[in-house]
Swiss-Prot record:
Keywords: Cell membrane, Disulfide bond, Membrane, Signal, Transmembrane, Transmembrane helix. This is Transforming growth factor-beta receptor type 3-like protein. InterPro entries: ZP-C, ZP-C_dom. Its main location: membrane. GO terms for cellular component: plasma membrane. GO terms for biological process: cell migration; epithelial to mesenchymal transition; regulation of transforming growth factor beta receptor signaling pathway; transforming growth factor beta receptor signaling pathway. The gene is TGFBR3L. Residues 164-175, 213-222 have a biased composition (Pro residues). The chain crosses the membrane at residues 245-265. Disulfide bonds join C85-C147.
Length: 292
């Protein structure tokens, strides 16, 4: 009986186990467009040169830093807008002490300068560049530059107004960062303008190592009104002539020889005589008489 029940349970289609809904599929991996960076933020201590660095930029305090923001992959369909930039002692762009550099693409610090824009690539947006002086505002050896950027999509099939016969006068020079035409809110409907607090803002952060150069040694204190006279150099020791040296050596040799001879004579005269053997009696002398 038990074997029959087990056999029926193993047969397909006769199991009494409840069949639930099928399990949902495992979420697929994100597409390649999610893994690729949209922007690049580079720092340099030299204008127009932004090499790839293995570590953070290292600059002395109160020196100029050059910044370049660009699209990671240039495309004729996208434009770039640089909205805000600031320097903080924290790696997180949280509200707190910060040195504001840019607001809405305009300088917020007197040291911010915009170099002439580089020549654009065919069909690509120009990178945004500016420079600032890293003043010693924060007492931190590592500081962080935070920049907010946005990407604007160019619309296709938009008709542009015909160019006038007489060119208009050049616009006055702007003190703000020139934005790409796709991100400039011109109101002509040819592009999509983005506000500074829009949902398409991206914040990029780059660390900066700040070094403090050693001050030069201080000069000695001097009495006011008196000029400090340089100390004369110490005279070099004069070289000895060979003739006096030879005479001194000969005199020392003669004195040493005379002293040795005198000591030898003194020792010879003051030494005691050695005792000799006892004297024998001569045979011719008187002999003792024999007793009878």
């Amino acid at each position: 009986m038990l074997g029959t029940v087990l056999l029926l349970a193993l047969l397909p289609g006769i199991t009494t186990l409840p069949s639930g809904p099928p399990a949902p599929p495992f979420p697929a991996a994100p597409g390649p467009w999610l893994r690729r960076p949209l922007f690049s933020l580079k720092l340099s201590d030299t204008e127009d040169v932004f090499p790839r660095r293995a570590g953070p930029l290292e600059v002395p305090a109160d020196s100029r830093v050059f910044v370049q923001a660009a699209l990671a992959r240039p495309s004729p369909r996208w434009g770039l807008a640089l909205h805000r930039c600031s320097v903080t002692p924290s790696s997180r762009p949280a509200p707190g002490p910060a040195l504001a550099l840019l607001r809405e693409g305009c300088p917020a610090d007197t040291s911010v300068a915009f170099p002439p824009p580089p020549p654009p690539s065919p069909g690509a947006a120009r990178p945004a560049r500016f420079s600032f002086r890293l003043r010693p505002v924060f007492n931190a050896s590592v500081q962080f530059l935070h920049c907010q950027l946005s990407r604007c999509r160019r619309l296709r099939g938009v008709r542009r107004a015909p160019a006038p016969l007489t060119p208009p006068p050049p616009p006055p020079p702007s003190r703000c960062l020139p934005q790409d035409e796709a991100c400039a809110d011109t109101g002509s409907g040819s592009a999509e303008g983005l506000a500074a607090d829009g949902p398409h803002l991206h914040t990029l952060t780059q660390p900066i190592v700040v070094t403090v150069p050693r001050p030069p040694p201080r000069p000695p204190k001097s009495v006011p009104g008196r000029a400090v006279r340089p100390e004369p150099p110490a005279p070099a020791p004069a070289a000895l002539e060979p003739a006096p040296v030879v005479a001194l050596v000969l005199a020392a040799f003669v004195l040493g020889a005379a002293l040795a001879a005198g000591l030898g004579l003194v020792c010879a005269h003051s030494a005691p005589h050695a005792p000799g053997p006892p004297a024998r009696a001569s045979p011719s002398g008187p002999q003792p008489r024999r007793s009878q």
